[in-house]
C-alpha cells in the first residue's frame, strides 16, 4: 500500500474544499432564498461533487448519488460508542439517534485511515438496487484490486454479546459463585479496530441498526494490532431488527464479515478475494445465514502476514470460549484457491452449536475441521455441537474431515466430486432435500428458504440470471468454474 499516495490524495481534496452552503453577506446572496448551513462534519469542493466527511455525523444526513464522499479518519454516526452507566443512557442514545441515509449508486471512498462506525442507537440506511448498488472503496485508485487500502464499515448495536465462559460486560453474579447473563445490565463491550472504536452491546436482541442492501465494500481491512482489526463489514452486537441482504465484501485484508455477538440474520452475500476468513462468528452470536458465495483470490499463492484464509470460522475456545455461540447456515458455496494451501474450508472450533445445511466445499486441503473447546479451567474440554445436513466437499489431500467428524450427519455428508458453472452453481442436478430445518431461535422468527439443492445458486441457473448478477463488482466471480486448487502442503 502506497501511504504517500493516499495522504497526497486526501491533501489535494482538502485543499480544494469549500462549504457546501454559505452564510455570506455579499450582494450575491441578497435575496430571500434560504441557504442551507453546511454540517460541521462535511466539507465539499467548489463544484460540490466531492465531499470529505470527518468526525461525528451528529444529525440526520443523506449521501446523494451525484456526490463522491470521502471518509477521512474515524467517522462516527452518532455518539453511541461512549460508555453507558445507566439504563437512561441507553434510552437517551435511542431517542437522540441519527440516521445516515445513502442513496442508490452512491460512491463512498475511504482514505488510508477512513472507517465508518454506526454507533449504538443510530442507523445506517444504505439501500442500493441491483442496477445501482452502493459502493465503499479506496480513495487510492479507481479499480478494486487493492487490499487493505482503507478501514472498513463497523456497525455497533444494542444486542447481546457474551464474554468468555459466563463472564463479561453483560454478566452479573449468580448463585454458588457462578455468573449469569443479566438481562437488565448496562453493557459496554470494548470493540476491536483500534482507538476510537469505543463500546457496543446491550440487552435488546431486536435492536435495529438500519439496512444494508445491494452494498459493495472493497479493498478495506485496517490492522490496529495483533488480533485487532477492522474487517470489511464488522457486526458488533447488531440486532435482528437490522436488515443485511445482497452485500459483497471484496479484497479485504482481514475477514470478509465478522459477527461479535448479536442476533442479526444475513442473506445473499458474496465474499471474494478476502485474505483471512470470510464468515467469522464468535462471542455469543446467535443468528442465521443463507445464500453465500465465498471465492478466494485465484491470483494469490500466499496470504498476508499471519492470515489463515478459511471460508467459515466459528470460535469458542480458550480465551474465546463462549458456549452461547450458535449459528445456522444454509446454501453456502466455499471455493478455495492456491492461497488456501494448508487450510480448511470450515473450522468449527470450541464450545459452540453449529448447524450447516445444503453446502458445498471445494479447493481446500481439508473441507471441515471440528475442534472441541479447551476452556482453560478445571472444567477441561467441552465438546462442540456440530450438525451437517447435505454438506459435500471436494478437498485434498486430507479429504473431508480433519480432527473429528460432526456430531450429527443427515442426508449426504462427505467427499463428493464437485464441478461448478460460471453462475457459481453446481453442475450436478442432484436433489438434496432437508426434512427438518432448524434456524437459530433468536427472536426474529427467521425461516430458511426451503431449497432442494446444495450451494448458493440453484443448478441450471444461467450466470446472467443468478441472484448475484448485475450488482457485484465486475469480474469478481469470473473464472470461478475453473479455479485452481491449492498445492498439497497440508500441515496442522
Task: State where each predicted segment sits.
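Extracellular beta-rich repeat passengers
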Residues: 30, 34-97, 113-121, 128, ...
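Glycine-rich loop(s) and the adjacent beta-strand/alpha-helix scaffold that form part
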Residues: 132-135
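Bacterial Sec-dependent N-terminal signal peptides
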Residues: 3, 10-47
